[in-house]
Amino acid sequence: MNRRDVFYNLERRVTPTRLLNSIAQSFNNPMNDGKTLVLVEGYGDYRYYKKMLIEKSVFIQSTSGCDNMNAILPILVKQQKCLAIQDSDFLKMGQHKIVSANMLYTDYHDYEMSALADDDFRKRYLEVLKDNGCDVDINIALTELYTLSYYKLCNELHNFRTDFEPVNKLICKVEKLDYNMIHGHIGSNSNGFYDITFGFLNGIIRSCPIDEDKKEYHLVNGHDLFNRLCFHSGGVVDEDFLRDKLLELSELSDFMKMNLYT
């Protein structure tokens, strides 16, 4: 189990009430006078934005997921200066997201994809990976994740409650990520599971065009991309290594190019 999965399992136990109590205890003290409370989704986001934002001006708090963030933001904005940074996910492809002056969204699917969408940063990143024995092609990995990512988009748009965990575990292991492979391994975490047929999925693909530059960076999430790059590395690197290198190479000058910064 990688570091991200460990923190994900811990974060699943966090509730909005516990989170509000924790914030009240940690943020409301004289050391944070004048600071803006900034909510981020998870541990990886916390590490990234802690490096990018001026610590003396902000107090960054992980909310252990977007559902908790959505629940507590309306309460917190009434009490103190508060902003939230949330993954845009499929926002550019029709997914409904909260509209609020206090809610900011990543330029692309998440912070990882927003960083890698920049040509200069992506070139530096791939060069460092190559120096560490991981000579991979991001474009190939993105293309291979196309069907799975549209499957996930379909699930979000229609709330089909599909459990992708069995497939997610195979992204770094299997040669093909086609419809048959995906459909054969997905499960359901509720009785409301809907069987997404091949024809239905193709209908979603046709009906959800995105007139955006680098649309694949809106469609694919960073977790899946890193796992696919692990597959193409032949086991040379793992997801934690890829994530750590992205954080290590990210500079304020990179962050300042993003619409999120402005």
Feature roles, as predicted:
Residues 1-262:
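Acidic, divalent-metal-binding catalytic cores of TOPRIM
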